[in-house]
Amino acid sequence: MGDITDLLSKVSIDDVYDEWEDQASGSLPEDAEIENVYKTLNVKIKVIGCGGGGSNTVNRLYDDALKNADLIAINTDASHLRSIKVKHKLLIGQKTTKGLGTGADPKVGEEAAIEEIVAIKKIVQNTDITFVTAGLGGGTGTGCAPVIARAAKEAGSIVISVVTLPFESEGPLRMDNAVIGLEKLAQFSDTLVAIPNQKLLSEVPNAEMKVAFAYADKVLADTIRSIVEIITKTGIINIDYSDIKTVMQSGGVALIGMGQSKKGGDRIMTALEEALKPRLIDVDVSTAKDCVFKIIAPPDITVSEVGKAMDEIKKKINPRSRIIWGLTIDKDLDKDVKVLIFMTGVSSAYLVKDVESARKAGEHVHRIICGRDRHGELDQPMIRENIFFNLIITT
């Protein structure tokens, strides 16, 4: 038995990959038919940036050459929208705002979106997954994001909303706007990623304000990119879209993690530890009920390394958790390994303590975090399956 284990530990995925490539290069009579079916099965993903912050996020994704997703920017500010590089842009509220923005009034942002609802419905149709991203607290993003999420939901799309909450220095009015917008957005989101900008300051404590905002854009973009790559990157072991769909709709608090090894050392464990490390908010992954993770590695990744990562994840989460995993070979990675993780059912004290302390008049936030049950009563602080949305805490 030991001899077999020793042998397997030396087997490179490269050997499997070469054989797989040889088979893939074949020209069987059924290949054309399979290819035609495959093209119809591709997951259609759109990322819609709402307002200035959301538009900046899709601009960053454009600069980073995100693949397998259409990028769209929507804003009331014609000048800012003009500076965004993405191909698809929509200026909303030409009658309401005349292209000059909303004056930080979410109601005006909402009216501007409703004014262009026909165009918005065309954008979100025939889409499997719609990302709605915005910096909450201002007028356009806060007001129009829920309108867009609702249109996408009604069109049959899974809706993943990825937003930031304001820095404390931006004042109480923007926080008031943000939490009201968050509550509206939650009603039409299958998954809601809420990133408190104040927590980002621990990452860039002495940065200028513009640098802090740019870092917030990066965190949003990295979060979206990780989910897109989990869904779309094909490989030796693929993650089925239907599994992802089930997890996204399964309810509960969730965590998204991403990690990449550096040169030398135990690369698979380095990447995994980085993916599981909570940089913004402390979470307990031992309660996770679903875990989706993808390893993206060079061809020399070994069976032993993959098994080691699997064993480590099993140690950290609930033994009854469902684990869905995939492996993609990327020759451009040289010797590095990337790990992407998505877990649902994790828990965090942040949900009831830190959010409320960040917002002195915390009734709105408390109601969002706890949700309400079918009878309209305030639910317990831990989010359960009957709550109307998922809150994702990002690492």
From Swiss-Prot:
Keyword Transmembrane helix: no
Positions bound to GTP: G52, G53, G54, S55, N56, G139, T140, G141, E170, R174, D217
GO biological process: FtsZ-dependent cytokinesis; protein polymerization
UniProt entry keywords in alphabetical sequence: Cell cycle, Cell division, Cytoplasm, GTP-binding, Nucleotide-binding, Septation
Example GO molecular function: GTP binding
Major subcellular location class: cytoplasm
One Pfam assignment: FtsZ_C
Gene3D superfamilies, per the entry: Tubulin/FtsZ, GTPase domain (3.40.50.1440)
Superkingdom, taxonomy of origin: Archaea
GO cellular component: cell division site; cytoplasm
Locations listed in the record: Cytoplasm
PANTHER family: CELL DIVISION PROTEIN FTSZ-RELATED, MITOCHONDRIAL DIVISION PROTEIN FSZA
Complex and partners: Homodimer. Polymerizes to form a dynamic ring structure in a strictly GTP-dependent manner. Interacts directly with several other division proteins.
Similarity-based family: Belongs to the FtsZ family.
Job description of the protein: Essential cell division protein that forms a contractile ring structure (Z ring) at the future cell division site. The regulation of the ring assembly controls the timing and the location of cell division. One of the functions of the FtsZ ring is to recruit other cell division proteins to the septum to produce a new cell wall between the dividing cells. Binds GTP and shows GTPase activity.
Record's protein name: Cell division protein FtsZ
Organism from which the protein derives: Thermoplasma acidophilum (strain ATCC 25905 / DSM 1728 / JCM 9062 / NBRC 15155 / AMRC-C165)
Record lineage: Archaea, Methanobacteriati, Thermoplasmatota, Thermoplasmata, Thermoplasmatales
